[in-house]
Swiss-Prot record:
GO terms for molecular function: bacterial-type RNA polymerase core enzyme binding; core promoter sequence-specific DNA binding; DNA binding; DNA-binding transcription activator activity; sigma factor activity; site-specific recombinase activity. The lineage of its organism: Bacteria, Pseudomonadati, Pseudomonadota, Gammaproteobacteria, Enterobacterales. Induction: Subject to complex regulation at multiple levels (transcription, translation, regulation of activity and degradation). In the absence of heat shock, or after heat shock, activity is inhibited by transient association with DnaK and DnaJ, which reduces the amounts of free active RpoH, makes it unstable and mediates its degradation by the FtsH protease. During heat shock, the intracellular concentration of RpoH increases, due to slightly increased transcription, increased synthesis and stabilization of the protein. This is RNA polymerase sigma factor RpoH. Residues 253-272 bind DNA.
């Protein structure tokens, strides 16, 4: 991987919400656009083509990384590792294979995230701040004496250590969490042993590309629907909301006819025309 390509994957994520908005703002590529760019990269080493392929697929990395949020690892780091996998996939993608890039890249993205989780999950810090470290070491001694705290004991410990009750409860929960190994042997009794984190990882034999594409299409369709609704006149918007979007209190044609002083047939025509415009916008 060239230094320029690598730098794209390793760019600081910064503010996560802003990053995700930026990733989702990049337009998706059609199959023809994707193939043309992939051919430029594959046959001519065109880094601008590589950049466009990467940026248009960042949203998929975000989508995949969300599935690993339960390990207590920073979401930004999971995304960044997934970006490295995306970079590797783009570099190795052969446009002649006949599959979309996302179908090829999803396995590379997940492989990098898996590696990061396996490398870091067990060393997630229980105490990261000075106050937490003080609480951790003192709480360990106190718990040996008192066991699991009731509310009065929580408040007593909080006063003694100069922290909040919330801090005590949070640290107590962290200390109670078992440090599970990643691999359980086949002899382990699944009823008596906690599940190893490896069992929570995604099934490598599964292909999530279709699901990701479907979810993304639904998101894009929702955005197009919102834009299309804004393009309708106020009365047509009201008719669509009342007839289709208000699940708890849908209006009949006659109710809307009475509201606007027109016939039910006229409302039906307005509804039909509005739906036609919305459908065209969603399918565009």
């Amino acid at each position: 991987m060239t230094d320029k390509m690598q730098s794209l994957a390793l760019a600081p994520v910064g503010n996560l919400d802003s990053y995700i908005r930026a990733a989702n703002a990049w337009p998706m590529l059609s199959a023809d656009e994707e193939r043309a760019l992939a051919e430029k990269l594959h046959y001519h080493g065109d880094l601008e083509a590589a950049k466009t392929l990467i940026l248009s697929h960042l949203r998929f990395v975000v989508h995949i990384a969300r599935n690993y949020a339960g390990y207590g690892l920073p979401q930004a780091d999971l995304i960044q590792e997934g970006n490295i996998g995306l970079m590797k996939a783009v570099r190795r993608f052969n446009p002649e294979v006949g599959v979309r890039l996302v179908s090829f890249a999803v396995h590379w993205i997940k492989a990098e995230i898996h590696e990061y989780v396996l490398r870091n999950w067990r060393i997630v810090k229980v105490a990261t701040t000075k106050a937490q470290r003080k609480l951790f070491f003192n709480l360990r001694k106190t718990k040996q004496r008192l066991g699991w705290f009731n509310q009065d004991e929580v408040e007593m410990v909080a006063r003694e250590l100069g922290v909040t009750s919330k801090d005590v409860r949070e640290m107590e929960s962290r200390m109670a969490a078992q440090d599970m190994t990643f691999d359980l042997s086949s002899d382990d009794d699944s009823d008596s042993q906690p599940m190893a984190p490896v069992l929570y990882l995604q099934d490598k034999s599964s292909n999530f590309a279709d699901g990701i594409e479907d979810d993304n299409w639904e998101e894009q369709a929702a955005n197009r629907l919102t834009d299309a609704m804004q393009g309708l006149d106020e009365r047509s918007q009201d008719i669509i909301r009342a007839r289709w979007l208000d699940e708890d209190n849908k209006s009949t044609l006659q109710e809307l006819a009475d509201r606007y002083g027109v016939s039910a047939e006229r409302v039906r025509q307005l509804e039909k025309n509005a739906m036609k415009k919305l459908r065209a916008a969603i399918e565009a």
